[in-house]
Amino acid sequence: MTVDLSPATLHARVVVDELIRNGMQEAVLCPGSRSTPLAFALAAAEAAGRLTLHVRVDERSAGFFALGLTAVSGTPVAVVCTSGSAVANLHPAAVEARFNHRQVVFLTANRPPEMEGVGAQQTIVQRGIFAHDVVDELILPAAGREVEAQADMQGWNAHWRAALCRIMARAAASAGPVHIDIPFREPLTPPVDGPVSPGDVAVPPTDEAFLPRCWQGRPAQRPWTEVCDTATVDLSLRTLVIAGQGSWELPALAGVPTLCEPGGRTFGVPLNPLCVPALLADPTTAPQQLVVVGKPTLHRSVTRLLADPTRPQIVVTAPTAPTEWADVAGQAQTACTNLTVTGESPQRWLAACAEADGTARAHVLDVLAGLRAGQRDADPGWLPSGLEVAYAVGEAVAADPTLLLFVGSSNPVRDLAVTHPDLGPHCWVNRGASGIDGNISTAMGLALHHPGPVVAFLGDLAALHDSGGLLVPTLENAPKNLTILVANDAGGGIFATLEQGAPAYEDQFERLFGVPHTADFEALAAGWGVAYQQCTLAELAGVLTSHAAQAGVRLVEVCTQRRHRHALAATLTGR
């Protein structure tokens, strides 16, 4: 039977189900109103024989009772309470659990965020209430009043379960307490025609009366994301590696097709990201599983691929940060720090990847040729696009193994990703928060230690944003060979490639997003005592290879245009 469940009931049942899958065998409940959904979910789980539920009246006592339980059992124990000062009464137990390295899960109900700060009854700011006395804290987003579309349901389910697996992994890794705060919207009680009390017939968690199919967890009671030291990858399946920023060498993946972002590591056959739609269009060439290394951030086609729940994903994280795996969509089935492999990549899969990659690379070259032929001859005021500059930069890096390239966020890194998707370790990018902060300063630091030449490829706004990084005190060491290459399109060209760059918004685009300027980079360089050179696209290759004759820091400017960036992006991606 299928029963219509409120968002609060669904939320609570998903949380209880996933915590049990992550090793919770006992829970301590303090009666309260806002925690009603959790109370009924725990009772149903106990009736199904999945955990033992204890009830205590006082939250302070309940917290220490849970501490005693986990001290002997060695398994995580949850303490559940309502909102308000009830949560504060758990703090003494949190202090003791932290000092005793015990996995107590403080599971607190809360009012939805719109009720904070407006005088709502029994409502306090519960975020951060345990301060440094928990090893981690998770604020699960409140479900809406209505959750209707199945895709929305699957998205909520994946995010909730993945977040719970992550915080439980951190509790285990740090051997300490964690705080999970859950805002619930009314109605708080389950339907009367569903399993609501221990007196009902026990309902297994796979029964759709307990959780509809799209809200259920992994088969065989596995955690949504299994955390382990070593995972095994069967390469006889069509396996695609996605290597983002911070990825590192994994010899086991040698020879496996790889989508590698600038700054990542290519393990096998490097693929142009533009080939993803072609691979997915044919069921016989679509990847059957994904291995994610590092933090992928650049391509929307890859983001959509990672959000697909039908394709198993293994995420590899650094041994120094085993609980910091990248999984934005919450679809990873396994998170590990090392890999072993069985089988070999099918030759048909390798051939399909090579063909799709070759087609994508040829398409990029055709687009570049069209830009040169179509605009340069027809427009006396022609300026190159940033894509053409990126191609010249990529060619220079590919030709000189001693050269280290720093790539700025926004258009430079995206352009380089499609013109030269296999530069890998020759690049460095600051994509942690994808900002344009401190790009020149980062390049200065790289250049001070790198034994060869360094080129920083930046947009004009990134260069202006950190122009102060050009200042090196006279008594300090300056880089010996740094070229700061600025592709100057006089504004925010990245926005022209996004939705707001569509023709429908043209009348407001320049003021709100393009932000045109007339900054003088020659004067700026002179003010900081840095050598300056302006060059054309045709001259750029020679300028980039002239580093042997130069010393110190120089700023090279190539004037570009962004009038056709939206159309160019559409042409590249086939939108």
Language model feature labels by segment:
Residues 2-6, 144-151, 155, 294, ...:
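Phosphate/pyrophosphate-binding active-site segments
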Residues 12-16, 20, 33-38, 363-451:
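Active-site diphosphate/adenylate-binding microenvironment
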Residues 25-29, 50-54, 72-111, 288-294, ...:
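A short, small-residue-rich loop immediately preceding and capping a beta-strand
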Residues 29-33, 53-64, 79-85, 408-409, ...:
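Active-site nucleophile and cofactor-binding loops and adjacent substrate-binding regions
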Residues 71, 89, 224-235, 239-331, ...:
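Glycine-rich, anion-gripping cofactor-binding loops and their flanking helix/strand elements
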Residues 96-97, 103-110, 114-131, 144, ...:
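Thiamine diphosphate
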Residues 114-210:
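Internal gly/pro-rich beta-alpha loop/helix module
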Residues 128, 174-222, 543-575:
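Glycine/aspartate-rich loop-and-adjacent alpha/beta segment that forms the canonical ThDP
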